[in-house]
Amino acid sequence: MSTVNHHCLLNFPHIPPSIPPNHRPKLLSSLSLYRKPERLFALSASLSLSPATIHECSSSSSSSSSSFDKEETEDIESVIDGFFYLLRLSAQYHDVEVTKAVHASFLKLREEKTRLGNALISTYLKLGFPREAILVFVSLSSPTVVSYTALISGFSRLNLEIEALKVFFRMRKAGLVQPNEYTFVAILTACVRVSRFSLGIQIHGLIVKSGFLNSVFVSNSLMSLYDKDSGSSCDDVLKLFDEIPQRDVASWNTVVSSLVKEGKSHKAFDLFYEMNRVEGFGVDSFTLSTLLSSCTDSSVLLRGRELHGRAIRIGLMQELSVNNALIGFYSKFWDMKKVESLYEMMMAQDAVTFTEMITAYMSFGMVDSAVEIFANVTEKNTITYNALMAGFCRNGHGLKALKLFTDMLQRGVELTDFSLTSAVDACGLVSEKKVSEQIHGFCIKFGTAFNPCIQTALLDMCTRCERMADAEEMFDQWPSNLDSSKATTSIIGGYARNGLPDKAVSLFHRTLCEQKLFLDEVSLTLILAVCGTLGFREMGYQIHCYALKAGYFSDISLGNSLISMYAKCCDSDDAIKIFNTMREHDVISWNSLISCYILQRNGDEALALWSRMNEKEIKPDIITLTLVISAFRYTESNKLSSCRDLFLSMKTIYDIEPTTEHYTAFVRVLGHWGLLEEAEDTINSMPVQPEVSVLRALLDSCRIHSNTSVAKRVAKLILSTKPETPSEYILKSNIYSASGFWHRSEMIREEMRERGYRKHPAKSWIIHENKIHSFHARDTSHPQEKDIYRGLEILIMECLKVGYEPNTEYVLQEVDEFMKKSFLFHHSAKLAVTYGILSSNTRGKPVRVMKNVMLCGDCHEFFKYISVVVKREIVLRDSSGFHHFVNGKCSCRDLW
């Protein structure tokens, strides 16, 4: 006899064969063995299946006799048939008392017990009473394969898969009953549910020996087993599929699902078309929803629409799963009208529908609509909470995501790894050091901090929350058995964000040599961003060449990163070339090229590109409109009326509500063209309290136009607000310093330090001979420090001769005039430009310098004089864009 190894499983639970009297169900007289069929029919027809009703119908019950004649035997059979009917009704109405009543009469039977016992087992398990089912089972003198199968399948339905396995092994050990096809289907289902795939494979061998492989139900269950097994592939499923002599729709669906899971959507569609050619087979809702989920790129867009048409033709548009899949499909292809139309036409919705709608609205940036859908969900679960929280993170609403996470904790909603990952991501968006430490501690306390996904998210969070030391410690202690590629990518991005791009490049080279970094679209995109931040064009070009050779250039996000990289490296020609050679563009592609023109302060070209965008009917996003409004600062002529029209019509034309970023950009445009009063009125008419960034935009414009009256009012507003970010603390401190309130300035700095914030020091750097030479104010760490300082002294003297006058108003320290000049003369940008002049004698080649913050007014004036003294073009990029200093003039026209 062929058996299966079961030494690893627990023994079957012991139930005594003889049931103690106190455990026996109470015998009701209503269910006596001698009930006439018409009486049972009247009983079963009653909608109230309570024992009291049964008792009322049984007043004429008679006792059993020792012998039966033919008529009495027929009566017993009729009564047993009535029991079956009662069991069906009790299962339908979930009335366990009737089942127990049948059970009581069952115990009095001397014959015909097995068939009724099997029905009792099934009914008890359907009602969720496994112990009572076992009591019936052990009372059977000769359980059949149906008895065992009823227990196995019932236990599986009740998530008692281990108990189901025990029953199967008891059956095999007894050796009196052989499993049938339904037994194999039930036990394979249990194996899949508890991930006992190796056991399932052993059972596969038993199925082959038992000759049940020709059963379509058994073969379908085997395909499902191999489909769910991570150690198997779709080839194993296909092999089984090819061996099935007769297939049903479930067979086709299983193999299609397996191909979709492995990303072989084209092969799945080929099988789908083959399925349609087989006579007698029609697709069902599972087929369509599975194939729709595989439509993730533009190459299968038409196929997805074809599936939609097929669903309409064959009448599957009322199926929930099909509608849910269609909503997911159209949201991937940015067709919100279709999504909303499908949702409105649905007769019913479920949790999946709401989750798909929340995800769709969030992907379109329609946060309020997503929140409204969530609010209308009556039975919220972990999945709906996770969808909303992930959507908040995707749209940059870290604080809202954290509040939702807190709500989940208070309501006792079950947390998953995805929930915690989103909460950690939200901390990174908020950039609150203390909050990040609390979430980090929460993950450690509940033992999830070492989950690979959460661990990577925690490292990334540390890089965003002023905790680079913690991030470096986590990276150094990264488990050797885990892939470190994502962690490496995160910490490289962290270095770039925290003003340490040189460290990012150094780590990139080291991990690349140690083969700890896998170069894919994500890592290449990140390192291109670092190259752009550094202005390291040569390295960016090498990455570009590698991407071409590796076949990554078709990736849109990589193309967008290349545009951005070349733009930040002052190479707009190559940025335009990349844009023109891309096979397809998304809104980010257009945004990247518009941003390129703005960095060069070329507003007219940016607006021309915006016109092309409108001609192609490409829908802008929030960032697009921010960039386009900003472009009006850099036009050759005043185009304020067009800018004003665009700003005021954002909601009506593009369905985008103006945000703080749009107000900030518009105020800068008004300030640039000298309309300070209108800018102030715009701020005062904002529907919400203006944020510091908007007020700062107006304050900068007041500096440019020397308008002290408006500046005082704006400064007063800024000082009345509570700072929330490091930049807001620094601005408030600087305002106090500029006004001579040194003590108040220091108090603000102290409060900033208490919150764990620190100011990123001003830093300038230059790329020379493929090396990054970095400087901060009064830096003496460079190997050529003496030559640099000597050269700078000479440059200062020469500039003083031709009219340069140091402007000590830009020194915000409480020191004497002599020290203020000393501070001014040794700013990081001056040191970097001096090194650039000394290290390059090529007169026709510009000196290229990068600075991480806005260039101060004194340095700006100084570089105009240097361009005259040394007869060299100086190209400097700061946070506002590029400055081209040529012959004593700057491309920004002193308006930056």
UniProtKB/Swiss-Prot annotation:
Region (Type DYW motif): 801-896
Residue ranges of the region described as Type E(+) motif: 770-800
Keywords assigned: Repeat
Superkingdom of this protein's organism: Eukaryota
GO annotation (BP), single: RNA modification
A molecular function (GO) term: RNA binding
Type E motif: annotated segments: 694-769
Spans traversing the lipid bilayer: none
UniProt keyword Repeat present: yes
PPR repeat residues: 113-143, 144-178, 180-214, 215-247, 248-278, 284-318, 319-349, 350-380, 381-415, 416-450, 451-481, 484-519, 520-554, 555-585, 586-620, 621-653, 659-689
Record InterPro entries: DYW_dom, E_motif, Pentatricopeptide_rpt, PPR_At4g14850-like_plant, TPR-like_helical_dom_sf
UniProt function note: May play a role in embryogenesis.
Family under the similarity heading: Belongs to the PPR family. PCMP-H subfamily.
Protein name, per record: Pentatricopeptide repeat-containing protein At5g03800
Biological classification of the source: Eukaryota, Viridiplantae, Streptophyta, Embryophyta, Tracheophyta
Gene (name only): EMB175
